[in-house]
């Protein structure tokens, strides 16, 4: 279910979770005219937990998946590379709510699969890697990294991970669990998890990939890390109160644009993947005020392509840039 959460959040819910002081200087803290402490949201776990606890009371309303696409702000110490790492950025955040850990990990697997399919559709080879949970917390996390020499993350991986086709799996629990196991049993980590001895032990020398990558997605399972301290409770099947189990799933939309450029660019041309390209074909005839023959040819090609339902743009401007 889509929603839209505000960018400005109350500090009170962050104090409830215990993260207000822990988050550090990346959080932009402000006060309103009454002196009330506010913040520009760097992430939304507290806010979505507050929304959920005010409206959902029973297991009968589960599972739930809520998401929004919204701006975030983090006071990055070294913003650089344009949209790749900036202080304000556009992001898709989704949050799952389940009755117990077993069902919650099924939701996690579904999002794991959905992310792989999404990046695959964008013609991107995104590698899911076991990741540190950082300030989000929890005990299960994967980041999705695409290889690019301009990336910030150091990547250590077994090249066999590229041989796994996400399309071979079905959108059902047993298949999704196998999918996550198949991907995660092959060595692939960033520098945060890298251990040289393990890399050499588990990956043959000829299969080792050591390069740079760009993180374009990150998913977390953190159980009741937020629901318990924030008293986000539901009635279970026996009528007892229990803390809801949660996960979060993010894709950096603005960063993804830059990442696609880095992954698809060569020294001669930048080629957008078809699902996000503005047009399939652009016709640029060499025209002038005194000669319309090329424009007429361009119009003929344009009409033929339109008949074939090809998304085409005809540039009929007769002025040089």
Give short role names for the model-derived ranges.
Residues 1-321:
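NTP/phosphate- and nucleic-acid-binding module
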């Amino acid at each position: 279910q889509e929603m839209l959460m505000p960018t400005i959040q109350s500090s009170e819910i962050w104090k409830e979770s215990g993260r207000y002081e822990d988050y550090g200087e990346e959080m932009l803290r402000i006060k309103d005219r009454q002196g009330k402490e506010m913040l520009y949201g760097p992430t939304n776990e507290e806010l979505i937990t507050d929304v959920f606890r005010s409206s959902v009371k029973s297991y009968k309303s589960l599972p739930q998946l809520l998401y929004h696409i919204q701006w975030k702000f983090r006071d990055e110490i070294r913003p650089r590379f344009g949209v790749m790492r900036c202080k304000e950025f556009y992001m898709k955040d989704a949050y799952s709510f389940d009755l117990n850990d077993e069902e919650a990990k099924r939701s996690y697997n579904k999002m794991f699969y959905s992310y792989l399919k999404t990046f695959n559709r964008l013609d991107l080879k995104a590698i899911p890697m076991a990741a540190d949970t950082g300030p989000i917390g929890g005990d299960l996390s994967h980041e999705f990294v695409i290889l690019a020499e301009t990336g910030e993350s150091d990547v250590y991986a077994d090249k066999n991970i590229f041989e796994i086709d996400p399309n071979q799996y079905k959108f059902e629990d047993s298949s999704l669990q196998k999918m996550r196991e198949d991907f995660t049993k092959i060595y692939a980590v960033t520098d945060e998890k890298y251990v040289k001895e393990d890399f050499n032990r588990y990956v043959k020398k000829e299969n080792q990939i050591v390069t740079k990558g760009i993180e374009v997605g990150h998913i977390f399972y953190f159980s009741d890390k937020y629901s318990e301290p924030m008293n986000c409770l539901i009635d279970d099947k026996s009528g007892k109160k229990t803390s809801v189990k949660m996960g979060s799933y993010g894709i950096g939309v603005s960063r993804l644009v830059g990442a696609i450029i880095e992954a698809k660019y060569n020294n001669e041309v930048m080629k957008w993947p078809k699902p996000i390209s503005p047009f399939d074909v652009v016709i640029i005839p060499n025209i002038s005020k005194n000669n319309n023959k090329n424009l007429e040819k361009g119009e003929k090609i344009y009409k033929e392509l339109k008949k074939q339902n090809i998304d085409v743009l005809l540039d009929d401007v007769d002025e040089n840039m």
